[in-house]
Amino acid sequence: SYHTTGGYLEETICNRLDRCQDQVHKFLAPFRELFPFGADYRHDQLHLRKELSPEQRRTEPRNADSHLTFIGSGLENCVTYPSNPSRPVFFIDLDGINKDNRDRRERTTTVIGYNDERVVDDVELEVPVSTHPIDSISLRDPRLGIFDQLHELLAERGIKQGRVEISLARDESHAG
């Protein structure tokens, strides 16, 4: 998914839900209750959001509830499933219809089929964090240079298509 209010459940979660659409809905229901639409979320105070143009402020949905449900329920932007035509892969769209004006969103997703995967490199990169106890860092921030380093590694190895997996170090404590 190219948007953080639509995504996929990891295969292991789908297996625990018997790959059943009704079970997926039941799984998501408590998160929708925990993060109700229309609560006083700062994200939904569009007049305060400096990153939005005036046109975007007129059309942007109030969807903090969907973002929080996405995060809280463990939805993913990218998942890997073994190919099995009899088993569903659920795309879960949490705000495909703008709750304010009933406009429908269009979604785009990418499916990549492959029959081979091999690790080309395993690199540790440092991510600076602030002194605040709760922090969020954009790995795409050009000041960090992380994506520049990744692109350099891919270019050095001649990789034009593939998958980059980013995760915390195994010995990382007090995280995740």
Regions found by a protein language model. Name each.
Residues 1-176:
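Active-site histidine-anchored catalytic micro-motif
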